[in-house]
Amino acid sequence: MVRHPEYQYLDLMAHLLENGDRRIDRTGVGTLSGLGAMMRFDLSKGQLPVFTTKRVYWKLAVKEMLWFLTGDTNIRNLLKQNVRIWTDWPLAAYRKATGEAISQEDFEARILADEAFAETWGDLGPVYGKQWRQWRDADGQVHDQIATVIDQLRHNPSSRRMIFHAWNVGELAGMALPPCHMVYQFHVSNLPSPGETKRPRLSLMVYQRSCDLFLGNPFNICQQAVLLAMVAQQVDMDVGELVWAGGDVHIYLNHLDAIREQLSREPRPFPTLRLLRRPDSIDDYRIEDFEVSDYEPHAAIAAEVAV
């Protein structure tokens, strides 16, 4: 019997519980960490790797990916969609700069109500979307990495250079949080020879330099699989495999009880993903375009984000 692919994730957390290197990290919370991990997910039959041993709010993950693809770096448009996963960083910066003990709810309300306030305090700096869609080189030329990769997939699918990344050394200091999922590389297999009609198969490998396994990784895996499905649709290819590689993989010390609870649960079948329409470009997808069926996870497990 084939082992459920979610065990790759569960086994990694169990390994860190037993063998992780205990350290005090940037956040002050403390972690059990290790270096180097890999997970592989075969998506060729329409599966979406949304983990099932706790509920993952997949729509939030997809909305974040769609936001990245717009090139936006301000949390205002996320908040308009009821996505609050980036609020902690600008909120912490505002409290530190002003000394005001504002609540998250009041801060978000001001971001939504006051465009000038949002422009000053809601921007995250040149984070993912800026680098993916508007990377500025030393000569001042702006590069749309996503558009370039899609063009390569259409016209030179055997290339080994179909990569985009967000680790812009010259702009790291201005980012609210340097990129964790850094490098995305596409690979095309099953390429037809002249005269053949078979469909190519598109796979994606992601390198993530730093990974909060309990809270962050379930979102990352889900949204990266969705990105693969979107790009495959745009370039008329079948979906292949998602390969995820982690650098510093860690679990936070304040998540240990929650992780033990999750490890006590048995994985359930992954749901399926269907794209309900084919937009004209990668820029035109909306959350309504994604249908996830047969997702029946265990209950959610709450935990605090380390900022």
UniProtKB/Swiss-Prot annotation:
Pathway: Pyrimidine metabolism; dTTP biosynthesis
Enzyme class: transferase
This protein's GO CC annotations: cytosol
Disulfide topology: none
Segment forming the signal sequence: none
Tagged with keyword Lipoprotein: no
Main location: cytoplasm
GO MF annotations in UniProt: thymidylate synthase activity
Localization, UniProt: Cytoplasm
Biological role stated in the UniProt entry: Catalyzes the reductive methylation of 2'-deoxyuridine-5'-monophosphate (dUMP) to 2'-deoxythymidine-5'-monophosphate (dTMP) while utilizing 5,10-methylenetetrahydrofolate (mTHF) as the methyl donor and reductant in the reaction, yielding dihydrofolate (DHF) as a by-product. This enzymatic reaction provides an intracellular de novo source of dTMP, an essential precursor for DNA biosynthesis.
Subunit structure: Homodimer.
Record NCBIfam families: PRK01827.1-3, thym_sym
Protein known as: Thymidylate synthase
UniProt organism field: Rhizobium rhizogenes (strain K84 / ATCC BAA-868)
